[in-house]
Amino acid sequence: MATAYQNLSEYDFNSVPDASEMNIGIVVAEWNKNITEKLLEGACNTLEKHGVKPENIVVKRVPGSFELTFGAKRLAETKELDAVIVLGCVVRGDTPHFDYVCSGVTQGITELNLMYDIPFIFGLLTTDTMQQSEDRAGGRYGNKGDEAAVTAIKMVNFSA
């Protein structure tokens, strides 16, 4: 893949719509907290750079990545939000658990996008090593939390 080793967190600031009136929910997994907290920091900083008021960013934590889908659904049901970002990190181990968690979260976020009239943004790192996760949580390949925030803002403004 051509973009596999690029820092995609660099973008044209002016290509992102004003977000000053947006309310954004973020659900972040506590598992691999050293990574997910960096993703959260990146997402919040980027949202604020584009005008989202800190008080309009609702952050909720769930124990692990598999719980992200339920957390996102519950957040969308209980708060008036324009988008929900899910942030997590799953690192491949020696068992098929990685595949089950990644597939479950991917399918769950897809279903939420089809069920609700707001975008649910996939910010789940699915990596083979912890180093790959660190590289994508503020390391040499940027911060995928930043990218999830930009995606959320753009999708709130999406119109067919």
UniProtKB/Swiss-Prot annotation:
Annotated residues for binding of (2S)-2-hydroxy-3-oxobutyl phosphate: 94-95, 136
Active site at 97
Q: Cite the annotated pathway.
A: Cofactor biosynthesis; riboflavin biosynthesis; riboflavin from 2-hydroxy-3-oxobutyl phosphate and 5-amino-6-(D-ribitylamino)uracil: step 1/2
Under which main EC class is this enzyme filed? transferase
- One of its Pfam families is DMRL_synthase
Q: Which SUPFAM superfamilies match?
A: Lumazine synthase
Q: Which UniProt keyword terms apply here? A: Riboflavin biosynthesis, Transferase
| MF (Gene Ontology) | 6,7-dimethyl-8-ribityllumazine synthase activity
Write down the Gene3D superfamilies for this protein, in alphabetical order: Lumazine/riboflavin synthase
Under InterPro entries, the record lists: LS, LS/RS, LS/RS_sf
State the reactions this protein catalyses: (2S)-2-hydroxy-3-oxobutyl phosphate + 5-amino-6-(D-ribitylamino)uracil = 6,7-dimethyl-8-(1-D-ribityl)lumazine + phosphate + 2 H2O + H(+)
**What family name appears in the similarity comment?**
Belongs to the DMRL synthase family.
What is the name of this protein?
6,7-dimethyl-8-ribityllumazine synthase
| Higher taxonomy | Bacteria, Pseudomonadati, Bacteroidota, Bacteroidia, Bacteroidales
